[in-house]
Amino acid sequence: MVRTRWQPPLRALLLLVLVWLPQSLSLDLIAYVPQITAWDLEGKITATTFSLEQPRCVFDEHVSTKDTIWLVVAFSNASRDFQNPQTAAKIPTFPQLLTDGHYMTLPLSLDQLPCEDLTGGSGGAPVLRVGNDFGCYQRPYCNAPLPSQGPYSVKFLVMDAAGPPKAETKWSNPIYLHQGKNPNSIDTWPGRRSGCMIVITSILSALAGLLLLAFLAASTTRFSSLWWPEEAPEQLRIGSFMGKRYMTHHIPPSEAATLPVGCEPGLDPLPSLSP
């Protein structure tokens, strides 16, 4: 009687194991760890996005042209609870990040990840920017901005066209986003500044004052001719003699001009030298 009562559960458990075991054994584990791009890019980690290197030359032996390569994004503390979806209908979307702690986005095909040397190319940096689509909240598999600092962990999952997963990579190391500061929390008191910064500020202030004084001096010299116009120098005629002018008070100028030499009043007449 006891064997008869426990026989159906054992059969159901055995059937579940037989169904799950081939799927787990057929899932290839690729020895690749996703990571932040090594390219020297500004803003490769922001408050809502981060840039991964593209997994080129990674899936060539595990993916066919009809397969899809998905990026799984999860909070680091929820990555161990993530279970690979068995069908396309079970793929978690972005809103589930806030409820379940994970979602899938950025579906790629193998031809979008060509295996080639990009160091000599003229195109842009080969990166996958997570959280870069600011207007996709209503679309499935949205790549919307990330809601918090994290940390986040990611992995790539290869799914067959029929749905079951075929291969996956390892989880990345925790990725922390930048966190902005509240303007009210920034201390602007000069006493908090370092000694070097105070010295630099003093030097710059002194230089600014010297430049201002030099500008004012140059402006004064340049425009002084407009404020005080120079008098034209008196021109001298060749052969002229300038000396003091003696004016007599008892002889009108008109009469003094007509008197012969030696007849000036008040002077004795010159003696005549004739016999």
Swiss-Prot record:
Family: Belongs to the uroplakin-3 family.
Membrane-topology annotation of the record: Single-pass type I membrane protein
GO-annotated biological processes: negative regulation of D-glucose import
Alphabetical list of InterPro entries matching this protein: Uroplakin-3
Assembly and binders: Heterodimer with uroplakin-1B (UPK1B).
Transmembrane portions of the chain: 197-217
Function field: Component of the asymmetric unit membrane (AUM); a highly specialized biomembrane elaborated by terminally differentiated urothelial cells. May play an important role in AUM-cytoskeleton interaction in terminally differentiated urothelial cells. It also contributes to the formation of urothelial glycocalyx which may play an important role in preventing bacterial adherence.
Tissues in which the UniProt entry reports expression: Expression is urothelium-specific.
Cytoplasmic side: 218-275
Keyword annotations from UniProtKB, A to Z: Cell membrane, Glycoprotein, Membrane, Signal, Transmembrane, Transmembrane helix
Topology Lumenal: residue spans: 27-196
Subcellular location: Cell membrane
This protein's name: Uroplakin-3b
Species of the source: Mus musculus
